[in-house]
A protein has these predicted regions:
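Generic secondary-structure signature for well-ordered alpha-helical cores
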Residues: 55, 125-128, 150-154, 160-168, ...
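Gly/Ser-rich, acidic/histidine-flanked active-site/gating loops
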Residues: 170-246, 251
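Short, well-ordered beta-strand elements within core beta-sheets of diverse protein domains
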Residues: 34-38, 143-150, 291-295, 372
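A short helix-breaking turn/cap at a secondary-structure junction
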Residues: 3-10, 124-206
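Short acidic, glycine/serine/threonine-rich loops at helix termini
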Residues: 27-28, 68-72, 112-118, 134-135, ...
Length: 389
């Protein structure tokens, strides 16, 4: 996988970006041949705010094609493999100390999976508290600009720098709401979701048990609860994500920008050949699925139903968070993915752990190999809780 280096030197306040975030002095490819060598005319709002806060961009790390895969294995540059396991480029750079933090676009949970397996802290904020202006659109109703670092304190510092209202983002929340999300506080009651705990292997269960023990020792009450509906978030999110992705990548037709096929007869053949040659297998699979979802025949019985499930999931979680401060859940099913053992569509199964946060827009913090899901605007509290794990 490529790492695009820039002029600034890495240092104590150096941040790595993933390749879904636009930068005017570096290529932005979204891990796809379709955007090979694409240069943006402007920086993303998150990049502008990082610079204003005194952070430097140490470079850009490649991502899986449009950020929908497990850890980046679908990138046009190929998977990044370490000791026979697939690893995430941005997470590895932070882990090696070459950057203080990684600022990434979390589309389908890859940022959180990477942090869990690398032993980093990662925060996916409440939807709308960080501007998405200047990010490559994939699944707009759930994707969030996220932060990963070695400590909760570093995550909070970088998140504070990029959070805030932005008039250029129509989904951006008010300044007061953005600030309230960063406020600390004590969470005294946490629940473990039995249905998700049963879907992971022994190593992940050991991480959950260790986190529960640490929280209990710190005076936090930990209980097990049953939430049968929570696994429905995966199916609903896959429907919404692929439908939105299908719509967003329709702009790449070989005419205005992006890859263009050389030999074609007519406009239709230009579209077909350009997309066939430039899109990868996983993205094509998602496009086909999304197209079928948005068809006249399936729109009401599939897409509309997924929107209804989203509302039910949000209502269920709000009810849970009226009693508990956070849910303690796995972030992955296993602590490593073998380079030769990952199915093409495994990302649509593995996201059962990350989909609840994606579809609900609620914040999630990964630490110690586990995930903490909280109510909207509770990321400050979740990061404080993470320090106890």
């Amino acid at each position: 996988m490529k790492l695009y280096n820039v002029k600034c030197e890495s240092g104590a306040r150096a941040v790595i970006l993933d390749d879904m975030i636009l930068t005017k002095d570096m290529p932005t490819t979204a891990g796809s041949k379709m955007l090979g060598g694409y240069m943006s005319l402007f920086d993303a709002e998150a990049v502008v705010r990082l610079a204003s806060a005194g952070y430097s961009v140490a470079g850009k790390a490649a991502v899986g094609e449009f950020g929908i895969d497990l850890l980046g294995e679908s990138s046009v540059d190929g998977a990044l493999v370490k000791d026979g396991k697939i690893v995430n480029a941005a997470a590895e750079i932070v882990l090696c100390g070459e950057a203080l933090a990684a600022v990434t676009l979390d589309v389908n949970g890859s940022t959180r999976r990477a942090a869990a397996q690398a032993g980093l802290v990662s925060v996916k904020p409440t939807y709308g508290t960080v501007s998405r202006f200047g990010t490559v659109p994939a699944a707009c109703s759930g994707e969030c600009v996220s932060v990963s670092a070695k400590s909760a304190a570093d995550c909070l510092a970088v998140l504070s720098a990029i959070s805030g209202h932005d008039d250029k983002d129509g989904t951006s929340l008010s300044e007061s709401e953005c600030k309230s999300a960063l406020e600390g506080g004590e969470i005294k009651k946490v629940a473990i979701v039995e249905e998700l705990d049963e879907l992971c292997d022994g190593d992940v269960k050991a991480k959950i048990d260790a986190a529960a023990s640490s929280l209990s020792a710190a005076g936090v009450s930990v209980e097990k609860i049953s939430l049968p509906l929570i696994t429905s978030a995966r199916a609903a999110w896959n429907i919404l994500m692929t439908a939105e992705l299908c719509n967003n990548v329709s702009r790449y037709d070989g005419v205005k920008y992006g890859y263009r096929a050389e030999n074609f007869l007519g406009l239709d053949e230009l579209y077909t050949k350009s997309r066939t040659e430039a899109f990868g297998k996983l993205l094509k699979t998602a496009i086909i699925y999304g197209s079928e979802t948005l068809s006249t025949e399936n729109y009401m019985k599939v897409y509309d139903k997924a929107l209804r499930v989203r509302r039910v999931i949000v209502e269920m979680l709000n009810k849970v968070f009226s009693e508990y401060g956070a849910l303690l859940m796995p972030a992955v099913s296993k602590m490593a993915y073998a380079a030769d053992g990952v199915a093409l569509d495994e990302c649509f199964v593995e996201n059962v752990f990350t989909a609840p946060a994606s579809i609900s827009g609620m914040p999630s913090v990964v630490c110690g190999g586990v995930s903490l899901l909280g109510a909207a605007f509770s990321e400050g509290k979740l990061l404080a809780l993470a320090e106890k794990i």
